[in-house]
Amino acid sequence: MTEKRKSPALRFRGYTDDWEQRKLSELTSMHARIGWQNLRTSEFLDSGNYMLITGTDFNDGAINFSTCHYVERERYEQDRNIQIHNGSILITKDGTLGKVAYVQGLSMPATLNAGVFNVQIKDANNVDEKYLFQYLKAPFLMDYVDKKATGGTIKHLNQSILVDFPVILPQRSEQTLIGAFFQQLDNLITLHQRKPLDKSSNLILTGIA
């Protein structure tokens, strides 16, 4: 982005409006399993009716349900803010920081283990979930985190770091087109077993070569 141009040069046909910059905290609320709710490994079940998603279950922007453990109903119901549904956006905050996943194909109730944020969109009429997922999955987020590190190493991605992360928003209908475009691109990449095209994401979302 430049000061003279508030939208990328590469656009979908018919869209000319400027894009706006908002803070992630203005668009979403972020929740994680807090300390007193932490699970012991002895509570992890090999089967059950309530799935437990951890950061190690993230796989190329999705959740590998085959690696997930399960928990008792009481643990699932403990916190509604970390109950996961299809369309949920998740970010790892411990271990490998900043990995992002979009939940699809979930067939049962699910909750989060410690170390993962549930990013909930406040107004679905203003923000498209697939657009936001693709924006967070692009290198912008980790570039921002690296700058916040100021020469050190961030071992935990705290909410205080994420709240001011800038998100560039086109109008809602254009977000939907962009999100769908990248979803199709991801599907093609998966089909051909190639790595995500991070540089292409940067180019199309910013219009900067």
Region annotations inferred by a language model:
Residues 11-35:
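Non-catalytic DNA-recognition/assembly elements of restriction-modification systems
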Residues 54-55, 66-137:
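A short beta-sheet element
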Residues 23-24, 104, 134-137, 170, ...:
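Localized chelating/binding microdomains
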Residues 37-43, 147-149:
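Short coil/turn segments at secondary-structure boundaries
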Residues 1-20, 165, 171-209:
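Amphipathic alpha-helical segments with low aromatic content
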Residues 4-8, 93, 109-117, 150-176:
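A short glycine-rich beta-alpha junction/loop motif
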Residues 25-28, 40-75, 119:
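DNA target-recognition patches
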